[in-house]
Swiss-Prot record:
Protein name as it appears in the record: SH3 and multiple ankyrin repeat domains protein 3
Positions of region (Intramolecular interaction with the ANK repeats): 1-75
Protein's organism: Mus musculus (Mouse)
Pfam family, one: Ank_2
Low complexity composition bias: residue spans: 857-869, 1078-1092, 1235-1250, 1371-1392, 1627-1637, 1649-1658
Region Required for interaction with ABI1, residue ranges: 677-684
Known function: Major scaffold postsynaptic density protein which interacts with multiple proteins and complexes to orchestrate the dendritic spine and synapse formation, maturation and maintenance. Interconnects receptors of the postsynaptic membrane including NMDA-type and metabotropic glutamate receptors via complexes with GKAP/PSD-95 and HOMER, respectively, and the actin-based cytoskeleton. Plays a role in the structural and functional organization of the dendritic spine and synaptic junction through the interaction with Arp2/3 and WAVE1 complex as well as the promotion of the F-actin clusters.
Gene Ontology terms: cellular component: ciliary membrane; cytoplasm; dendritic spine; excitatory synapse; glutamatergic synapse; neuron projection; neuron spine; plasma membrane
Modification sites for Phosphothreonine: 912, 1130, 1234
Motif SH3-binding in this chain: 1410-1416
Amino acid composition bias (Pro residues), ranges on this chain: 444-460, 812-844, 1251-1261, 1321-1333, 1638-1648
Annotated positions of the Asymmetric dimethylarginine modification: 965
Ranges of biased composition (kind: Polar residues): 1122-1131, 1495-1505
């Protein structure tokens, strides 16, 4: 009205209430409503209840005054000609009295509140007579009920059978357009109540169907919005209701009908001319809305009626694309496959009520017909409505309406019929309808609620058809109907009805059993075919439908998925008995199918191939990394959990028929999109982990897919960049890279890495020999590179072990990471473990690790490494695969062990190297995980989680590379070193790979395999260390070789596989395998079941049976064998095994389950144990090598003793992985002290490192322990399991830990994974340690390894390669954590993860959150004999280490703090062991390491103390007691454990282990610490050493020889095997406790304990001034400000800097939010106060 057109008329409007008069130009051709709005806008005063003001035409010329009906045109009311200007009043709508019936007093008396309330009650009670009486007295019915806001007319409109009441009210002066307080008219109310009778009456009384409510919405809009019986919708449309009303968001009725799936309303709207192309404010048409909200029926109607499916919304998306984005693939397919030839426009014309005056309607009608005419070909403007309805008026737009009608027909023919019939069919006019209304007023089950109405009228005239029904819809009679009129047919419940057409009045025409006729629409209900599909369809069918888009290219036009090329194929795999299928399976873990999972083009199924061995069985069958499993042996597995799929694969035996879908991005998408197309990032995983979230949030998932694409690109780029670093890996992983999805963390460029290193004082990657390490580098790089690359990318490679574990624990594993390419970057790290530290990927990344813990790559690597290691010794070859598989845990590792083995050797000159390279491609049959599957079936199955760890599918190659590397470095055993399959998961943690690798074979080989020149070996070890992946793979794979171990062995899992080379089945297998290996060692060259001759880890050459390495391997094997029984109980942990935890984790977390993992790391042969040491060795190979002879001896002796007391060894390894650790430790020990270690696999791992023949010739101190050690050893397996559990625990703490680790460059999960293996390797590290040590093989680094080269490795390599050196622990922890998180053992594993985050270096790793769940387990194991068991071992191993550590600690000042704590725990068995360890500590190598070990021990002890404090044990006894056998402070040990244990929180894992078990748990935390320790890296030798010292002390105690301590320290120190039960127990509790808080209670006795600070974390146990930057990061995490951690660490902010930080400093550090700064300052004040 504001801008009236040429026809505008000037009208004088008086507003009596405001005593104003306005002259306004109003448009006579517009509705009165528009004029009213014009007036309201012109007012300068607000009116109360303005909506109920109306334009009143005063009486004139004998005519009574009246209010103008708002929906009629202004020109319908002739102006008063008595005045010069037309005059209208704007006044509140009151009853208009024909004459002054009553005076004011009487009026006031009538309208009292009581009377008005009484009047409303009369209306409510249908008291028509009383209502009429009051109205006759002059009561004005236009008022609001003070309570409900209703007015009498609106209330009556909601009542059934209120026709008479409505008439009385209307005649009594009620305004039809009077609105309730909510702004609704009676017509709106009747429509919303679906009261067709009342609506009909109101319309008959002259109400307009187009009254607007307070939002300007019409009754028709409300009808489409509310759904239910479509009769009201039909009545309104029939009465010329206006179409196209839009709300504030531009939604029209058609949009709302589609939004809520009101098909019949939609059909009616379309029939009456609704614009199918109408777009809302976002540009979405009704079809877009259907696509978005998955309303398939509505979409079919729209398409059938000719909707344009090519219209794009304002985001330039078609409906098809919207459907894809929303994850509604079935609907997307419907849209995609719809053809124009399928369109059937309405052939009929809509009927209209003729009673409406054309004046008002003409305006309305005209536009409507036009609308329809545009789309209707059959528009016959004049076609009268055949229906006898009140007054059907046919408009030109009837054709349009016809079209709509047809659509509606399809939808709900009956609804309209009923509605119209009532009014038009002669049913008896509106009144009749009204009765029917009540019946049909409620929402009818069927489309036509009016059906009751129709029956109401006795004489039913002939039904009139409105339009044809949409074909393809199925209806079933839900209630019986008996014919009551002409042409009607009877219906019986349950009959299938074919609807032919939609008639008037809610009647539909249909056919039932040959009978054709009319029936009420509400008698039938539509049955969604889709529902049937989902109910009866197998997942396979669903998958077929889902992927049809891919195959038919239906997604081609979808931008989001246009970059995906979906290719489905059926592969038939036939393998030999002892080989695998050659692929690693990864995916979500779930006991039951995850129905919430919605396949997307990028992530079509939950399980996918994380890696495929090149030239393996699967490869030859055409399977490739990243392929999603749709069917396995004919069973649809799109939504099936990992374990079940593994079970299906195993059930098939040697034959496997898999239907897979390859999702690849189109090459054209060169841009960022070309990343990893296949698996969505981890959306499903999230969905995996949080399955409902990711999987269900289609849009989110879509976004994640896009993100993934970006990541993919990153991976590709990374691969491109990495080749320069190591082309090998690039080649091997190039495919993986593409296939594997990388975590979304940002990529770190080499430059950034360098700067990171510089910042952290770590040697740059270039410094790391690993990267350039001869053949190994690339091999290593495959797995490690990924990690490194991920690190470089800023994304931690998925820490397969940890992350996966966590993830696996609950959730779908992330899609295959197409991040294999990233490994190249990790390769850098590989070369330098320090990078591990340096690239602290974003916490997210680190946490990605949680997700990533599911890294297939790592898993694969682990498996591969193990296999490789084992491979060197003949039997080991096959076993490795199973172990590797186990490691893969969640992922079915179907790679052949042999190939892995082959790969590992590649770097080294021995025969192994060639094989390793092979393995990298993983072509050989043995490589096939399935080959292992046979033997490890159970384990594999159970290990689904562990397997999962091998998360990077692509990484499998990397694993192989790692194996090659390991083989190279470790020689034959090297592969064992390579057993850090974890490492293979490049995504796990960039930094970790190095550690893993280093630990893996090389260090081991150097230490025990003398074949390679010491320096060369050391160098190799170092490289390997850097490329933990490689070594890890070797070690793990090597270890796992136990053929006996069924892949599915539940508890055995990877650790077990690793541990048991096949000597036994199940967990025992794992242990036995080490034992077997040991036996062969003892027996002679062929000591291990895997191979009579052990192969040098570094050189790959057969070891001289008498050589320390061979002895250590043999001892380890023996220990494993002895442990086997203990392990067998681990089946409980089978879930853990399933979870792809780190090897160590496996062993630690679940001795049996995980045991294989650890075992591989400590493979019965030297390879098995090598991993632990190897990892350490990798870091400290040089040192280790140097120490190799003597250190090894003493260490080995220690370890041997420890080995005897597997618990101790396990404990040592415990941190790493309880089961694994012992295995690793034992293996290491065995290696050094060949036969002697047989009983103590753990010890072997721990001792093997330092002592060539720990078992054979236990050192003075160690020998005493051997007995207990053995006992421990036996129990240790249980403990080991306990350790394993922690990995599962990747809870928030874990997350933090991971984050921290990532930041530090140690990614806990991978590290854990690696740790499991690395730890194993590190023990052998003493000899190789020097080699590995990035920092020169100096006594000090060694000393960091305190008792054994481990310390050295830790100190040098570990520091340089935090991942490497601390990796063993960290990795162990990670592994554990991973296992834990992934596995059912999550409770235990969780702790581990957390723990490992914080400890070393202030490192996040330590105790970020000791797995809490493990707590209980830890405790029970602690109490159990295992602890005792472990204690001897611990004491032995730990004592020797601790002694040495103590020595150093004392010198460093660590001893005092750590000493007390340690003894406390250790005091029980520890004291005994301690005595031995003291002697052990005399070992030259360990001595050098001692200071570091002590510091680490001290740090750990401090943490433990803190934890212990919670337990009530002395907080600071820590290192000193730990180191000092005399000090029998189990609590101290426990504390250490706690700190470490927290990390590994494996305490509870091995309940069977008894005290040893407790110790095992301890070890687990230790694993965490190792990571931390590793974190320090060469850059922070002091803190690292200190941490390491602590770790070494604990670890040392755990593994007698210095070699092991660092590695073991990490795992062991926490576990403090020496302190068997008590320590373990305490640790366990502490761990659990710590897990959240971290070992803050422990003060930081160790000088280098900087990292520890905070009750549960290392930092909590140190004074603020001693905090390292990692402690600061942990502390930030603890106050929930972890997002600032990266910046703080980048700026090298240490504890001493915190108090001096100013506001400007905080801003520079990224703390821009005042609240965050205040929180930090408050927390600092609290620290000061405390």
């Amino acid at each position: 009205m504001d801008g009236p057109g040429a026809s505008a008329v000037v009208v004088r409007v008086g507003i009596p209430d405001l005593q104003q008069t306005k002259c306004l130009r109003l448009d006579p051709t517009a509705p009165v409503w528009a004029a009213k709005q014009r007036v309201l806008c012109a007012l300068n005063h607000s009116l109360q209840d303005a909506l109920n003001y109306g334009l009143f035409q005063p009486p004139s010329r004998g005519r009574a005054g009246k209010f103008l009906d708002e929906e009629r045109l202004l020109q319908d009311y002739p102006p008063n000609l008595d005045t010069p200007l037309p005059y209208l009043e704007f006044r509140y709508k009151r009853r208009v009295y024909a004459q002054n019936l009553i005076d004011d007093k009487q009026f006031a008396k009538l309208h009292t509140k009581a009377n008005l309330k009484k009047f409303m009650d009369y209306v409510q009670l249908h008291s028509t007579d009383k209502v009429a009486r009051l109205l006759d007295k002059g009561l004005d019915p236009n008022f609001h009920d003070p309570d409900s806001g209703e007015c009498p007319l609106s209330l009556a409109a909601q009542l059934d059978n209120a026709t008479d009441l409505l008439k009385v009210l209307r005649n009594g002066g009620a305004h039809l357009d009077f609105r309730t307080r909510d702004g609704l008219t009676a017509v709106h109310c009747a429509t919303r109540q679906r009261n067709a009778g009342a609506l009909t009456t109101l319309l008959d009384l002259g109400a307009s169907p187009d009254y607007k409510d307070s939002r300007g919405l019409t009754p028709l809009y409300h009808s489409a919005l509310g759904g239910g019986d479509a009769l009201c919708c039909e009545l309104l449309l029939h009465d010329h209701a206006q179409l196209g009303t839009t709300d504030e968001n531009g939604w029209q009725e058609i949009h709302q009908a589609c939004r809520f799936g009101h098909v019949q309303h939609l059909e009616h709207l379309l029939f009456y001319g609704a614009n199918m192309g109408a777009q809302n404010a976002s540009g979405n048409t009704a079809l877009h809305i259907c696509a978005l909200y998955n309303q398939e029926s509505c979409a079919r109607v729209l398409l059938f009626r000719g909707a344009n499916k090519d219209v794009r919304n304002y985001n330039s998306q078609t409906a098809f694309q919207v459907a894809i984005i929303a994850g509604n693939f079935e609907l997307a397919e419907v849209i995609k496959t719809h053809k124009d030839s399928d369109v059937v426009p309405f052939r009929e014309t809509p009927s209209y009520a003729k009673r409406r005056r054309l004046a008002g309607p003409s305006g309305l009608a005209s536009p409507r017909p036009l609308q329809r005419s545009a789309s209707d070909i059959n528009l016959k403007g004049d076609q009268p409505a055949a229906s006898p309805g009140p007054t059907l008026r046919s408009l030109p737009h009837q054709l349009l309406l016809q079209r709509l009608q047809e659509e509606k027909d399809r939808d709900r023919d009956g609804e309209l019929e009923n509605d119209i019939s009532g009014p038009s069919a002669g049913r008896g006019g509106h009144n009749k309808i009204s009765p029917s209304g009540p019946g049909g007023s409620g929402p009818a089950p069927g489309p036509g609620p009016a059906s009751p109405a129709p029956p109401a009228p006795p004489p039913r005239g002939p039904k009139r058809k409105l339009y044809s029904a949409v074909p393809g819809r199925k209806f079933i009679a839900v209630k019986a109907h008996s014919p009551q009129g002409e042409g009607e047919i009877p219906l019986h419940r349950g009959e299938a009805v074919k609807v032919l057409s939609i008639g008037e009045g809610g009647f539909w025409e249909g056919t039932v059993k040959g009978r054709t006729g009319w029936f009420p629409a509400d008698c039938v209900e539509e049955v969604q075919m889709r529902q049937y599909d989902t109910r009866h369809e197998t997942r396979e069918d669903r998958t077929k439908r889902l992927f049809r888009h891919y195959t038919v290219g239906s997604y081609d036009s979808l931008t989001s998925h246009s970059d995906y090329v979906i290719d489905d194929k059926v592969a038939i795999l036939q393998k030999r008995d002892h080989e695998g299928f050659g692929f690693v399976l990864r995916g979500a873990k779930a006991e039951t199918p995850i129905e919430e999972f919605t396949p997307t083009p990028a992530f079509p199924a939950l399980q996918y191939l994380e890696s495929v061995d090149v030239e393996g069985v699967a490869w030859r069958a055409g399977l490739r990394t990243g392929d999603f499993l749709i069917e396995v042996n004919g069973v649809n597995v799109v939504k099936v959990g990992h374990k079940q799929v593994v079970g299906l694969i195993r059930q098939g035996g040697n034959r496997l028929v898999m239907k897979v879908v390859s999702v690849t991005r189109k090459p054209e998408e060169d841009g960022a999109r070309r990343r990893a197309p296949p698996p969505p990032k981890r959306a499903p995983s999230t969905t995996l982990t949080l399955r409902s979230k990711s999987m269900t949030a289609e849009l989110e998932e879509l976004a994640s897919i896009r993100r993934r694409k970006g990541e993919k690109l990153d991976e590709i780029l990374a691969v491109a960049a990495e080749p320069t670093l190591r082309p090998d890996i690039a080649d091997a992983d190039s495919r993986a890279a593409t296939v594997k999805q990388r975590p979304t963390s940002r990529r770190i460029t080499p430059a950034e890495i360098s700067s990171l290193f510089e910042r952290q004082g770590l040697p740059g990657p270039e410094k790391l020999p690993g990267s350039l390490r001869k053949g190994i580098p690339r091999t290593k790089s495959v797995g490690e590179d990924e990690k490194l690359a991920s690190l470089l990318e800023g994304r931690f490679p998925r820490s397969t072990s940890m992350q996966d574990t966590v993830r696996e624990g609950r959730g779908i594993p992330p899609p295959p990471q197409t991040a294999p390419p990233p490994p190249p970057a990790p390769y850098y790290f590989d070369s330098g473990p320090p990078p591990t530290f340096s690239p602290p990927p974003p916490p997210g990344r680190a946490y990605d690790t949680v997700r990533s813990s599911f890294k297939p790559g790592l898993e694969a690597r682990l498996g591969a490494g193990a296999a490789g290691l084992y491979d060197p010794s003949t039997p080991l070859g096959p076993l490795p695969y199973p172990e590797r598989q186990k490691r893969a845990r969640s992922m079915i590792i179907l790679q052949d062990s042999a190939p892995e083995v082959g790969d590992v050797p590649r770097p080294a000159p021995a025969a192994t190297p060639p094989e390793r390279p092979k393995r990298r491609p993983r072509p050989s049959g043995p490589d096939s995980p399935y080959a292992n599957l046979g033997a490890f079936s159970a384990s594999l199955f159970a290990p689904s989680k562990p397997q999962r760890r091998k998360s990077p599918l692509v990484k499998q190659l990397q694993v192989e590379d790692a194996q090659e590397r390991a083989a190279l470095a470790v020689g034959s055993p090297g592969p064992v070193g390579g057993s850090f399959a974890r490492e293979p998961s490049p995504t796990h943690r960039g930094p970790r790979p190095g550690s893993l690798d280093y630990s893996s074979g090389e260090g081991l080989g150097l230490t025990f395999g003398g074949p390679s020149p010491g320096p060369v070996k050391e160098r190799r070890l170092e490289e390997r260390r850097r490329s933990t992946v490689f070594l890890s793979v070797g070690a793990i794979e090597g270890s796992p070789p136990s053929a006996d171990l069924p892949s599915l062995q539940p508890s055995r899992s990877i650790d077990e596989r690793l541990l048991g080379t096949g000597a036994t089945t199940g967990r025992d297998l794992l242990l036995p395998s080490p034992v077997s290996a040991l036996k062969p060692l003892v027996g002679g060259p062929s000591l291990g079941p895997s191979g009579s001759t052990f192969i040098h880890p570094l050189t790959g050459k057969p070891l001289d049976p008498s050589s320390p390495l061979a002895l250590a391997l043999a001892a380890r094997e023996r220990a494993l064998a002895s442990q086997t029984p203990s392990r067998s109980p681990t089946p409980v942990h089978s879930p853990d095994a399933d979870r792809p935890g780190p090897l160590f984790v496996d062993v630690q977390t679940r001795d049996s389950e995980r045991g294989p993992l650890a075992s591989p790391a400590f493979s019965p042969r030297s390879p098995a144990w090598i991993p632990v040491p190897a990892r350490r060795e990798a870091e400290k190979p040089p040192r280790e090598e140097r120490k190799s002879p003597e250190d090894k001896k003493s260490m080995i002796l220690s370890v041997l003793d420890t080995s005897l007391q597997r618990p101790a060894g396990l404990i040592v390894v415990h941190a790493t992985s309880n089961g694994q650790e012992p295995s690793r430790l034992g293996a290491e020990e065995e290696r050094p002290g060949t036969p002697e270690l047989a009983p103590a696999p753990m010890q072997a791992a721990a001792v093997a490192e330092p002592m060539p023949s720990p078992r054979a010739q236990p050192p003075g101190s160690i020998p005493a322990d051997p007995g207990p050690g053995q006992g421990s050893s036996e129990e240790e397996p249980e403990l080991v399991f306990a350790v394993n559990l922690p990995p599962a625990q990747l809870s928030s703490s874990d997350e933090e830990t991971r984050e921290e680790l990532a930041r530090i460059g140690l990614v806990p999960p991978p590290e854990e994974f690696a740790n499991g293996i690395l730890l194993t390797t590190p023990p052998p590290g003493p000899g190789p340690l020097p080699t590995t040590v990035p920092s020169p093989a100096s006594g000090k680094p060694s000393s960091e390894l305190p008792p054994a080269p481990e310390s050295a490795a830790d100190s040098g390599v570990e520091e340089a390669d935090t991942r490497s050196s601390s990796d063993p622990h960290l990795e162990t922890t990670s592994t554990i954590s991973t296992v834990s998180s992934m596995s059912t053992l999550s409770s235990e594993s969780g702790e581990l993860t957390d723990t490992h985050t914080s400890f070393a270096d202030g490192h996040t790793f330590l105790l970020e959150k000791p797995p809490v769940p493990p707590k209980p387990k830890l405790k029970s194991p602690l109490g159990k004999g295992p602890v005792t068991f472990r204690d001897p071992l611990l004491k032995q191993s730990s004592d020797s280490e601790l002694m040495a550590q103590q020595h150093h600690a004392a010198s460093t000042g660590l001893a005092s703090a750590a000493g007390p704590a340690r003894p406390r725990y250790l005091f029980q068995r520890r004291s005994k062991l301690w005595g031995d360890p003291v002697e052990s500590r005399g070992l030259p190598g360990p001595e050098d390491d001692k200071p570091t070990v002590i510091s680490e021990l001290s740090s750990r002890l401090q943490q433990l103390n803190k934890d212990t404090r919670s337990l009530g044990e002395e907080p600071v006894g820590g290192l000193g007691s730990l180191l000092d056998p005399a000090k029998k402070s189990p609590i101290a040990a426990a504390r250490l454990f706690s700190s470490l244990g927290e990390l590994s929180t494996i305490s509870a894992q091995r309940s069977p282990g008894g005290p040893g078990g407790g110790a095992s748990y301890s070890v687990r935390p230790s694993g965490r610490y190792p990571v931390a320790r590793r974190a320090p890296s060469p850059v922070k030798p002091a803190s690292l050493e200190r941490v390491e010292g602590l770790g070494a002390g604990v670890g040392g105690a755990g593994r007698p020889f210095g070699l092991t301590p660092p590695t073991i320290l990490k795992s062991s120190s926490l576990s403090i095997p020496h302190e068997p039960k008590e320590v373990r127990f305490v640790v366990r509790s502490v761990s659990a406790r710590s897990r959240s808080p971290s070992p803050s209670p422990l003060p930081s006795p160790s000088p280098g304990s900087g990292p520890s600070a905070g009750p549960r974390r290392p930092f909590q146990q140190k004074p603020l001034q001693l905090w390292s930057k990692f402690d600061v990061g942990d502390w930030l995490e603890s106050i929930h400000l972890g997002e600032h951690r990266d910046r703080f660490e980048d700026h090298e902010i240490e504890g001493a800097h915190l108090p001096a930080l100013t506001k400007e400093d905080f801003v520079e550090l990224g703390v821009t939010r005042v609240g965050h700064r205040m929180n930090i300052e408050r927390a600092l004040r609290q620290l000061d106060g405390s």
